[in-house]
Swiss-Prot record:
Main function: Important signaling molecule that activates signaling cascades downstream of NTRK2. During development, promotes the survival and differentiation of selected neuronal populations of the peripheral and central nervous systems. Participates in axonal growth, pathfinding and in the modulation of dendritic growth and morphology. Major regulator of synaptic transmission and plasticity at adult synapses in many regions of the CNS.
Subunit structure as annotated in this protein's UniProt entry: Monomers and homodimers. Binds to NTRK2/TRKB. Can form heterodimers with other neurotrophin family members, such as NTF3 and NTF4 (in vitro), but the physiological relevance of this is not clear. BDNF precursor form: interacts with the heterodimer formed by NGFR and SORCS2. Mature BDNF has much lower affinity for the heterodimer formed by NGFR and SORCS2.
Secreted is among the record's keywords: yes
UniProt-listed Pfam families: NGF
Source organism superkingdom: Eukaryota
UniProt-recorded name of the protein: Neurotrophic factor BDNF precursor form
Main localisation: secreted
Family: Belongs to the NGF-beta family.
Family matches, as SUPFAM superfamilies: Cystine-knot cytokines (SSF57501)
PTM remark: Mature BDNF is produced by proteolytic removal of the propeptide, catalyzed by a FURIN family member. In addition, the precursor form is proteolytically cleaved within the propeptide, but this is not an obligatory intermediate for the production of mature BDNF. Can be converted into mature BDNF by plasmin (PLG).
Length: 114
């Protein structure tokens, strides 16, 4: 909820949910070349290892947006809320067992398409 009185009552065109996802949850992803890579659970650092986390946002399947985008006139437009993806860097292993930092696709937003 917004604390600014001028913004009260504002609703997004599409409902979304965001959550932190670990590499253990993700397991595999698609890299920039379109290949499937294994997402490594831990990243080696000087004092041990750190877990990889990704902040993902996607359309909420339980939200209002099942019937189209909020605020779009259904008599004139056919609208749909869709999850879009962006690339982020992650420590991964490819099919040839090569480990390295690659850009992978993750869910990052929920947008309205007409």
């Amino acid at each position: 909820r917004h604390s600014d009185p001028a913004r009260r009552g504002e609703l997004s065109v599409c409902d979304s949910i965001s959550e932190w996802v670990t590499a253990a949850d993700k397991k595999t992803a698609v890299d920039m070349s379109g290949g499937t890579v294994t997402v490594l659970e831990k990243v080696p650092v000087s004092k041990g290892q750190l877990k990889q986390y990704f902040y993902e946002t996607k359309c909420n399947p339980m939200g209002y947006t099942k019937e189209g985008c909020r605020g779009i006139d259904k008599r004139h437009w056919n609208s749909q809320c869709r999850t879009t993806q962006s690339y982020v860097r992650a420590l991964t292993m490819d099919s040839k067992k090569r480990i390295g930092w690659r850009f992978i696709r993750i869910d990052t937003s929920c947008v309205c398409t007409l």
